[in-house]
Amino acid sequence: MVLLSALLAREVAGDRAGLITAFIGAIYPFLWVNDGLIMSESFTGVAVVGTVLATYKAARSPNQWWRWLLVGLLGGISALGRAELVLLVPVIAAGVLLAPRIGAIRVRLIASALAGVALLLVLAPWFIYNSSRFEKRVILSTNDGLAMVASNCDEAYSGNVIGLTFLRSADCLPAPPRGDQSVVAEEYRRVAFKYMSENASRVPIVVLARLGRDWSLFRPADMLSWNVAEGRPRWVTSLGLVFYYPLLLGAFVGAFILWRRKRWIWPLLAPGLVVSLGAIFAYGQIRFRAPAEPFIVILCAIALSAIGRQGASNRNEDPLTQ
């Protein structure tokens, strides 16, 4: 992931940004902590960075149609790791359609369509397989029902634990109905939506709490003990948060610099948008923002690179240094 992140930063902002990204990425705990957990985050992180890198490469040569197929292919691989990442290619495609710099509208339409077709081709075998083994329709996973029902209950809607999930609570996790996991997921979704409709006034507050937890902007200390239960040592989460806040601030600066330079920034922001959408419909957890972590590092590195370059330029222009 570090290598791909460095290559992406180099593609967007030059060699200096790539080197800074490689250095920060090698020591940033939230980039390497998931590797030892044998969970999907490490795999999907690589695939997401690869998808965005392929997007920038394709945008440089928009008439090389195979490049857009590669974008969809890598996006499909990302979605097989985490279901919410099925939104990544559509979100990127929306940015392509709205970016005149890529080419004429015809080129952008074809590019977006090719990426979408490739995404569907990657997901089709899994969808067909699921259609043959479950009673109800399952596109990617049956986990959505479980995540929704355990995150839409009294415990998750109030108090100090608002915005989290409760898989071990009998009040939050009702007895499953008869049938396979697709039947269970369908029933859990029904229960979750019913609870949401009955508590509609609380939903906006809960959504804000979920987003705040996802981005460590609301009660971040809660994740110290929460992450221990998932196999992350307490000290790693603490160290990760020490790194995270300066990097996040730097990422905002980097995004602003790219915007001022009229560079195409949308693909770098797309993973963060998808991560946020996932939190809105599930619950907030540091691990869920793993696909967006490399882009925080990249944008911060771009800011540091620009500041360093500006400083060097000022020294060269200072007559006292001549």
Label every model-predicted segment.
Residues 61-66, 100-114, 233-236, 252-270:
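Membrane-interface helix-loop-helix junctions at transmembrane boundaries of multi-pass membrane enzymes
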Residues 2-27, 46, 60-66, 70, ...:
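Transmembrane-helix signature of polytopic, membrane-embedded enzymes
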Residues 137-220:
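Membrane-proximal stem/loop segments at transmembrane-domain junctions that anchor or position
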Residues 195, 203-268:
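Membrane-interface anchor segments at the N-terminal boundary of transmembrane helices
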Residues 18-29, 33, 53, 75-79:
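Short helix- or helix-capping micro-motifs
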Residues 1-13, 50-54, 249-253:
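Transmembrane-helix motifs of polytopic, lipid-linked glycan transferases
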Residues 16, 51-70, 96-103, 304-307:
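Membrane-interface transmembrane helices that cradle and orient dolichyl/undecaprenyl
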Residues 30, 36-44:
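Short acidic/glycine- and proline-prone juxtamembrane loop motifs at membrane-interface regions
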